[in-house]
């Protein structure tokens, strides 16, 4: 066997350890449908894996990059198919739990999306929102610009309601 000193051996083990990570293609993807006259991006939050950023500061970089890529594709589809620059985001929270809530991730994502896709969001439609979404929304609300806030909708039994700080109670 190779002659490796104990500290070195420990280092090798750490390097080989893979952090559990979000299955990107299941978490965020283009929804191809003629039903809506818009490019649609789906985000299934149950596939989001929360990580400890202290241990792994760049841990979400791949997630952000993937989401930007998918949304860029959505803009391209909107332009070529619908002569538009807007997309709709479906945020489906079915099967999501408290353990997955990461406000830092949400805040960072908002900043990235607002700077990269300033005028491209038509609506963000939240489906199957658990009660804890309301807590998270209150926390991230101050970071969402006033125009974008108006684009958040709850979907309940096929009806859309705008999310306001009044109906978030």
Locate each region found by the language model:
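SEC14/CRAL-TRIO lipid-binding/transfer domains and related phosphoinositide-recognition modules
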Residues: 1-119, 123-127, 131-169
